[in-house]
Amino acid sequence: MSGTLVRMAGPTVVAEGLAGASLNEVVRVGEERLLGEIIRIEGDRATIQVYEETAGLALGEPVEASGEPLAVELGPGLLGSVFDGVQRPLSELAAREGDFLGRGASLPALDRARAWEFEPAVAPGDRVEGGVRLGVARAPGAPDHPVVVPPGVAGRVAEVRAGARRVEEPAVLLEGGATLALLERWPVRRPRPARRRLPPDVPFLTGQRVLDCFFPVSAGGTAVVPGGFGTGKTVLEQSLAKWAAADVVVYVGCGERGNEMSEVLDEFPRLEDPRTGGPLLARTVMIVNTSNMPVAAREASIYTGAAIAEYFRDMGRSVALMIDSTSRWAEALREISARLEEMPGEEGYPTYLASRLARFYERAGRVETLGGAEGAVTMVGAVSPPGGDLSEPVTQCSLRATGALWALSADLAHRRHYPAVDWSVSFTLEGDRLAGWFEREAGDGFGALRDEARKLLQRERELAEVAELVGTESLQDAERLVLESARLLREGFLRQSALDPADATCPPAKAFEMLRLFLEWHRRAGAAIGAGVPLRSILDTGLGARLLRLGQLPAAEVPAAAAALRADLSEALARMEAE
C-alpha cells in the first residue's frame, strides 16, 4: 500500500491514500525511504512520526506502508552491540558511511553473514511451544546464546538442522511447514508474555550500601534516579551496570548530550566485568539516541530497550534496564504532541504522560517465563529535572509509577560524597517486603539496625541546624557525639569509593557487620559519656579512624577486623571509666 505526502511539520508528516493502514505500522517516507511509524489515522489520512531528519522532503513524494509494526530483531549477536533508537547497528553503519549517517541509511540489526554453531536440545517428534529451549548458538569470542521458541508458536518438531547456521536460516522445522530460525522479530510496544508474575521478595542487589541497606528495590522492581546536572546519574548507572546482580545490562542513552554518550561508549569497552574478567560490554546491549539525533527515534528508544530486555528475561536471566534519561524521552513526547496539536498538560507535556510512563514501567517484573524458568527485568530510570526541581511533571509522574526514589543531591556531589544519594529525600516502597530476605541472608536484626541508623542521621540534621546558630562548642558532649557518630556513618558507611577494589561493591553480610559496629560504637560511647568520660578522650583513641577504613577491607576480612576493633573499644572505654 502506498500514499503521498500532503503535509509536513518537522518529524511529523501526513500522507493520503493509506486507508487500510493500521496504527503503529512502519512506513517508508519519500524518495529516500526514511523510516517512520503511523501514530494517527483519520479516514485515508495517516499521521506519521519520522525517525530521521525530514529536511528536504517535498509534498507529493511517495509513502509506502510495510504492513508490520515497529519491531526489533532478537537473536545471537545482540550482546556487545551498539544500536540507535530504532535498532540500527551504529558500528556497522559508521564503518560503511563514516561518523555522520546519511538519511535513509539502514542495515539489519543482526549480522546476516555470521555463522553460529547450533547445538539442538530437541529431536524430531518433540512437541514445542513458546518459551521451550530449542538449543544453544555458539560462536568464537561470543557468549553462549540460548535459542527459545517465540511466544505464540507451537507444534511438533519434524526436522532439526544442527551445525553452522546464519540467523535467518531455519534451524528447526515443525510439522505443517513452519520454521524456526535463530532470529525472531518482536513489536517493541507489545510486552512479551510470561506464565505468571512472582512476588517481589528478592532484592536487586546493587553493591551500593546506601541503596541496598536503606532504599532497596526488588528484582524486577523499578527505581527512579532524579538529579540535576553534575550529581552523578551516569556514574551511578555505570556502577550499577558493573556491580549489580544482573546477568545482562541494557543501557539506553535517551537524548543525552553527544559528548556524554561518546564518553560512555569509550569507557564501557574498557570496564572489566568482575564476573568474568572480560570487558563489561560483552554482557551489555547499548541503545544510543543522542540529543542531536531525530527526536521521534528518541521516543521509540526506550521501547526498543524494553523489548530486548524482555527477550533476555525469557531465557531465565536477570536483566537490568538503565534509562538515561526519561526526561529527554518525555521532551520528545512533548514535541510530538505539540506537532499533533494535542491539548497540552502541565508545563506543555501531553496529558497522557503519566499513563505512558506507568504503562512502560509495568513491563518490569520478576516472572516465571513461558518455559518455566525464572527471569526478571529491573528498571532504573534517570530523571533530569530542570534546576533539580523534584516537583516538575516527569519526576512526579515517575514517582507514582515506580517503587523507589534514589534522589541525588548536588550538595553531596560537590562534597565528593559518592554515591550522592540524599537519604533525607529518598525512599522505597519495598523495604518491608524485602526485610525477611535481609534478615535471613545478611544477619538477624538488620531491619532494626537500619531504622536506628536513619534515626541517628535525622537527629544529626536537627542538631546541625542548632549548631549553625549557637556553634558546635556550645552543645553538650552527648549531642556532639551524635554529630560525630553520624559523620562516621556518612563517611565510612554511606560513602563508597568506586576506585577502591574492595569498596566499589559491598555484599549485604559485610554491610551488616559494618553497620552493627558503627552503631555499637555510638551506643557504647554514649554510655561512657553518661558515666562521666569526656568526648575528647573517646575521640583521642583513634578508633573512629579505624571505623572509616572498614569499607576498604575485603568482605572476608571484615568480621576479624570488627572483632579486634570491638575488643579495643571495650578496653579503652573500661580504662577511661576507671580513671
UniProtKB/Swiss-Prot annotation:
GO terms for cellular component: proton-transporting ATP synthase complex. Keywords: ATP synthesis, ATP-binding, Hydrogen ion transport, Ion transport, Nucleotide-binding, Translocase, Transport. The keyword Translocase applies. Its EC number is 7.1.2.2. SUPFAM superfamilies: C-terminal domain of alpha and beta subunits of F1 ATP synthase, N-terminal domain of alpha and beta subunits of F1 ATP synthase, P-loop containing nucleoside triphosphate hydrolases. The keyword Metal-binding does not apply. InterPro entries: ATP-synt_VA_C, ATP-synth_a_Xtn, ATP_synth_asu-like_sf, ATPase_F1/V1/A1_a/bsu_N, ATPase_F1/V1/A1_a/bsu_N_sf, ATPase_F1/V1/A1_a/bsu_nucl-bd, ATPase_F1/V1_b/a_C, P-loop_NTPase. It is an enzyme of class 7 (translocase). It catalyses: ATP + H2O + 4 H(+)(in) = ADP + phosphate + 5 H(+)(out). GO terms for biological process: proton motive force-driven plasma membrane ATP synthesis. One of its GO terms (molecular function) is ATP binding. ATP binds at G227, G228, F229, G230, T231, G232, K233, T234. Belongs to the ATPase alpha/beta chains family. Produces ATP from ADP in the presence of a proton gradient across the membrane. The V-type alpha chain is a catalytic subunit. This is V-type ATP synthase alpha chain. It comes from Anaeromyxobacter dehalogenans (strain 2CP-C). The lineage of its organism: Bacteria, Pseudomonadati, Myxococcota, Myxococcia, Myxococcales. The gene is atpA.
